[in-house]
Amino acid sequence: MKFEKGITIEVSCNIEELLKILKENDFELKEVYDIKDIYMIDKKYKNIEDKLELLKHTILIRDIIEENKETKQITYKYKEYDENGNITKQGKTNCKINSIEEAVNLFNALGYEKLININDHLLVYANKDDEFVIECVNNKHIY
């Protein structure tokens, strides 16, 4: 499993204001892509009320749509949290697949069910020192 470091925050301004701030700080657009995630959960865990604990038991069936290619994969995200719900360790592992529908059918047969669909539009900006990934989630939230 590949472990990662990162910070996720919800942005309080609109996308236009955020892009203006990035441009003023010499950030340039490097990449644009979309991710369509289907979160699947083992039925025995579906009634967990703690959202962070619930997400520990999910598998993502993911369609990544870039300008010149499309990648379909199963993703498992591993996260550890502190007592305040902050991520202290995270990683993920991926397995490429040929069909989103066949993957959903396989997990249904294994006792999983669809929990939620999340559609992300991602913009990657970078300058000489830093890189930011702007994630527009379901056309409502910006991270």
Per-region residue spans from a language model:
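N-terminal strand-loop-strand beta-hairpin
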Residues: M1-D129
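Beta-strand-connecting loop/turn residues
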Residues: H121, N139-K140
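Charged, well-structured binding/catalytic surfaces in domain cores that contact anionic ligands
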Residues: D130-N138
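Glycine-rich, acidic/polar active-site loops that bind/position phosphate-bearing ligands
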Residues: Y143
